[in-house]
Amino acid sequence: MKKFFGLALCGIMALAGSTAQAQSLSPSTKWHWDKGTIVVETPERPAGQEHALNLAVAPIKTVRVAFVGLGMRGPGAVVRFCRIPGVEIVALCDYEYDRAAKCQEELRKQGLIPADIYSGEKGYEELCKRPDIDLVYVAADWNHHYPVAKCALENGKHTAIEVPSAMNLEQCWSLIDLAEKTRLHCFILENCCYDDYEMNALAMAQDGVFGEIIRAEGAYIHSLEWFWDAYWKDPADNDVDNLHWRLKYNKENRGDLYATHGLGPVAQCLDIHRGDRFTTLVAMDTDPFFGKELVKEKTGKECKEFRNGDHTTTLMRTAKGKVVEIQHNVMTPQPYNRLFKLTGTKGYATKYPNPELALSGEALKGTGAPQVDNLNAHGFMSAEQRNAMMAKYYHPILKKYVEKGRDLGHGGMDFVMDSRLVYCLQNGLPLDMDVYDMAEWCCLAELGTLSMDNNCAAVTFPDFTRGHWNDQKGYKHAYATPEAEAATEAYAEAYSATQKEVAAKKNLWALYDAVKAAKEAGDAKAEAKAQKKLDAAKVAAEKAIEKAMKKATAKK
């Protein structure tokens, strides 16, 4: 492994300075009026560039990952990846060095090879130039999701981006073009697609339990009262009112800024860009009654302008005549709610406030649940009947991963998401979500703003696939053959075990501590000397792992 720690010390929770702050409305978006509807124009696909539907790359037996952004969400991702076989965490990056160093301790705890640490405004750029990284995992603040992902793709790295992965149409189209041009994955880290209820409901939908799904609802309703001051404050964001990045972004931007938690799972159930697509959008919001009061409370002065409404509602119609409603409210006090409702010709599903099902009696056949006379979906099923349905349609992906990650974030959905990402990369399969999902789920901010800024006018929804939305019939997860899956998992387990053995044998953490101690003492000469020893030991460790894995593979 080459040494980048010395020149590195780079990171992100901000990456401020030269990076322009994202806004809901992008200057490059072209649109015109047509009979009272705002028609958003779709840029032509560059010559020689092909779509990236079902994109698959050669299997990556050992996924070498770098994390950028270690404030709120990033540290949890590091913890999870430390527990996924066949992964090597190569680099940790945050604007603040101490945050990255703190995450390093999780690698020590698990006995893995120490990662190189990057910090500061531009460190992520140096990180992305490294030749020994397969995946850049972006969990920075919203303003820096796009620039880091763009840099990663331009430097030949797959990227996984926390939500929202793009803040406007310009960023959506840029990431699409980069993914299509480079043939690299651009994955949206939408964990709610891996929730137990949503995954089981998806399995039911795919088996026709609900009949034809005609309407769906999703939301992000979550009072952030206890979080506003915990969000990072970007030194270069001109945050004179000390609002921290997320409240400041809501103050300056309109639209559903966080649509993906609600939209992602229902879009999969409706086969969006896999046989259907969104065609028209209309958005409406309340005035920012709570938002203005919140700013006044924090600043002690009247808030004259607050762009985002307290509660935003977005309605979308599909090419096949379905309707989706998405809501956003991070202001008013109320219970957490993602809605997740499916209305079909044969049944109904809802997750909040309690998970329920209402189905015809036909749906219960073969589940082992007790039959009830004249069950006709006029009321919710009994708990016994519902549990029987959930058991029958318990998703195979949940069976494989969720119990291993129950305590690793949001009831296990985070671990399932990361495990599936690694699984698909290791087996050379299309990812569960592609760059078009990312664009479709993130573009509501700009499209909704266009609607609301023009008296809630109808807005056409771009076809991000540029003509290929009907090529694939139905949403599907990709799986390796049982034999290939077993071989990949055996290699991954062996690699992780070997990495731990070599890390201990080479005394890598003692060498890392010597670098850390010299740095804390301010002894640059001693730090450079210790760093040189650590670099050499890590190179030797990589060679030892490679030799051991070749030997193990040859035996088989």
Residue ranges and their predicted role:
Residues 135, 141-142, 146-194, 208:
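Beta-strand-loop-alpha-helix segment that lines the small-molecule cofactor/substrate pocket
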Residues 185-187, 192-306, 421, 455:
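Predominantly a Rossmann-like dinucleotide-binding segment in NAD(P)-dependent oxidoreductases
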Residues 2-8:
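Sec-dependent signal peptide recognition
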Residues 14-21:
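C-terminal segment of classical bacterial N-terminal signal peptides
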Residues 24-110, 518:
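N-terminal Rossmann-like dinucleotide-binding module
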